[in-house]
Amino acid sequence: MTTANTNETAAAAAAKNRRNKKKKRVCAFCADNIDRIDYKDVARLRKYITERGKILPRRITGNCARHQRQLTKAIKRARQIALLPYTVE
């Protein structure tokens, strides 16, 4: 193998790695310096629920573990007092 072929192969491999690398999602609550998630903030909670009414997982939302736990509790509490539906008709 010549030096030119080696450089081309290395460049192609580096480009392939850049394409496959996913960008790390940042927790929206940490970015906004929100300490506690309020169950009465229905507009914010709706962003983390699917159209079927399920809570979106952490790998999709990008939340940290602490805020994902708080978010889940807030959504469940909002459902109990009928601010959010359990299911969508």
Curated annotation (Swiss-Prot):
Region ranges (Disordered): 1-22
Ranges of Low complexity composition bias in the record: 1-15
Any one of the GO BP annotations: translation
InterPro entries assigned to the protein according to its UniProt record, in alphabetical order: Ribosomal_bS18, Ribosomal_bS18_CS, Ribosomal_bS18_sf
Record-level Gene Ontology MF annotations: small ribosomal subunit rRNA binding; structural constituent of ribosome
One Pfam family it belongs to: Ribosomal_S18
Domain of life: Bacteria
Keywords: Ribonucleoprotein, Ribosomal protein, RNA-binding, rRNA-binding
GO cellular component term of the entry, any: cytosolic small ribosomal subunit
Similarity field: Belongs to the bacterial ribosomal protein bS18 family.
Subunit structure: Part of the 30S ribosomal subunit. Forms a tight heterodimer with protein bS6.
Described purpose of this protein according to its UniProt entry: Binds as a heterodimer with protein bS6 to the central domain of the 16S rRNA, where it helps stabilize the platform of the 30S subunit.
Name of the protein this chain belongs to: Small ribosomal subunit protein bS18
